[in-house]
Structure formats: C-alpha cells, structure tokens
Regions:
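Extracellular/lumenal glycan-associated surfaces
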Residues: 64-72, 118-127, 172-188, 242-252, ...
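Short, compositionally biased low-complexity segments enriched in polar/charged residues
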Residues: 30-59, 100-108, 112-114, 156-166, ...
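C-terminal structured domains
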Residues: 192-336
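Extended intrinsically disordered, low-complexity coil regions enriched in Ser, Thr, Gly, Ala
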Residues: 71-97, 131-144, 185-207, 255-275, ...
Length: 336
C-alpha cells in the first residue's frame, strides 16, 4: 500500500531520531536535521523510499549530508507527490516507464553545506548497465555529461566495474560522479603491490598527485573489507583531483556490526589507523551506538527498522589526505 507523504516523512523522522538519540545528534549530526527533513520531503517519489544514507564526516563541526534512494520497485508510472521530485520529475518518470537497466535512482543533498536546491542524482548500476545512458544524462540536464562518462568508462582497468554514476549540478563544474567497485582478486593484488593501484589510477585518467595514497589505501587494504573508488569527471573531460577510497562493509545484523567496532574488531582496527592519520576524532566511537535493528508496531502491522554503517570513505585531494566519512544506511520495512 502506498504511504502518504506525511507517513513517509514521519518514518524518516523516526529513523533519524533513533540514530541521533542519547546525545549523538550533538556528536555526529549537528543542527542539520530541519534542513535534511525538508530535503527528504522534496524527494518523495514512487511508492515508498527504499532507504536513506546519513553521510557523517568524522572531524570538524558535527553535520551530515542526506541521500534518498529508490529501488526500481518503488517507482511507479504515477510516481510523484505534488511539488516533490526536486526538479527531476521527468528523469524519474522516464526511468520508471522506459529504462530497463540499472537498479534504482537516488538523490544526494549537501545538507551540511546548507545547499539542497540542486541535489545530485545518481543511478545505481551494480552490474545492470543502463540501456540509454545518453537519455539519463540529458534528463539530468548537465551538458556533455554522457560524453564525459563514456570516455571515463571506456578506460576502466581490469577488475573494475561501475557501481553507480550521476551528476552534481550544484557543485563547481557540474562534475559527473563515477563510483567503481574493485573485484576481490584485483583488490588483493593492490594489497600485495600498491604500484598496481597507482598504475590503474593513472590509466583511468587520474592525474593528480598520489602522495597520500600509501597511507590511505594502505589502511583500507589492510582491512578485510571490499574496495570502492570514487571519481569526478569535470567539464573539460579531465578527472578531478579528488579521489575517494571506500571500505565496503556489506550488510550484517546490528549486533554483528557492533562487534566490529569493539576492541580488536576489524572496523575498530581500521579506525585506529584513520585516527592516526588525523582524519577522525573520537566521534567515530559514537557510530557504534547509532546503529540499530529493531521492530515496532505501526497500526495493524509491524515495521522492521535498521540503521547500519555500510561503508567508510577516505578522500584525498591534490595528493593530500582530506577527510573521512561514515555512511549510515537506514530504512523501514513492513513485516508480514
């Protein structure tokens, strides 16, 4: 049954409140909640949100950015609430009715910067390529984006595949964002010889300094987690100077994920390295308590709610270590 916009907004508020309870709002999320709520309401499409991500920086002022994601199953032919869609109504309707590739769409809002009027829009590719890449970028209204994306994708090294792609029209140069998942064999080869990663980064067009790569990649590759890489392709077709390197945790029950944050756990070990690099303060410990996996009654049905860290991103820019962020995925599902 399709929920009203008020019902969806109330569910979002519950997901956020559970994560931010017991003082965690001040430590992790700051004062962004009202603007994030507004961004969520602008995003409402389809028959229900699949999940949201709270993108939480691990140093500096407490704040967060918001991602609102929709699986294909959530997008119907009459998909939009009045006034919602953040200007991407035609893109979402085309995707729901005409495009058979990809596994869903998502908005991304720079809430922490106070900027929600021009959100990014991404398509989750994940081994199901779009049939009409050109139409996606045309409806995303960024000139030349399809050409930039294709040129980058044609240079992907062995063992890489596009996980998601999209555009950030509100950022300087309206970059095309491409996230690449590295298969386990290639990832382990990087762990054995970091020069292979340096070679592959150069071959895909990343030309900026790699001075901080040994520290950042070394920390990630010493962990057991998967590896993703994020790139921005700029207006002139060049790959931008910022590189994202992410440890992908996968999805596990909250109790199991918490154990990874305990002393000796794989995430705790990784975060110890990140702390040594100066990219996080003690707030990362609060992420352990922000996660949950619970059920609750909601009228005549039962909801399962969860909030779990799905990956950690480390960024470098012009060769220098820049920052670290946790991405907390949260969702509510009806049971039975």
């Amino acid at each position: 049954m399709r929920k009203s916009s008020d019902e969806l907004a109330a569910l979002y508020d519950t997901l956020y409140a559970l994560a931010a309870d017991d003082g965690r709002e001040q430590v992790l999320f700051g004062t962004c909640a009202p603007l994030a709520h507004e961004a969520f309401e602008r995003s409402l499409v389809g028959d229900g949100v699949s999940y949201v991500w709270f993108e939480v920086p691990l140093a500096g002022d407490a704040r967060f950015d918001l991602h609102v994601a929709y699986s294909r199953e959530c997008l119907g032919s009459e998909s939009f609430f009045p006034g919602a869609g953040s200007g991407y109504d035609e893109l979402f309707q085309w995707y729901a009715q005409n495009e058979t590739g990809g596994q869903g769409l998502a908005f991304a809002y720079d809430v922490g910067e106070g900027a929600i009027d021009e959100p990014a829009v991404h398509v989750n590719v994940n081994q199901v390529p779009l049939v009409d890449v050109g139409r996606f970028f045309e409806l995303a209204s960024v000139d030349g984006a399809a050409t930039r994306y294709r040129a980058f994708a044609d240079r992907l090294p062995h063992g890489w595949r596009v996980w998601y792609m999209g555009v950030h029209p509100g950022r300087p140069g309206a970059p095309v964002r491409v996230d690449c998942f590295v298969d386990r064999k290639r990832r382990d080869a990087y762990a054995d010889d970091l020069r292979l990663l340096e070679h592959d980064l150069r071959s895909c067009g990343f030309a900026a300094s790699l001075e901080a790569l040994p520290e950042l990649a070394g920390a990630l590759l010493a962990s057991p987690f998967g590896l993703e890489l994020q790139f921005d392709v700029l207006e002139d077709g060049q790959v931008g100077p910022t590189l994202g390197l992410s440890a992908a945790f996968g999805m596990s029950p909250a109790t199991q994920m918490r154990s990874l944050f305990d002393t000796g756990g794989a995430i705790a070990e990784l975060m110890g390295h990140v702390e040594e690099l100066g990219l996080t303060d003690a707030r990362w410990h609060s992420v352990r308590d922000a996660m949950y996996s619970i059920t609750m009654a909601a009228g005549d049905h039962v909801l399962a709610l969860y909030c779990l860290p799905t990956f950690l991103k480390l960024r470098m820019r012009e060769g220098h270590a820049l920052d670290a962020k946790f991405y907390l995925q949260a969702a509510a599902r009806e049971l039975g």
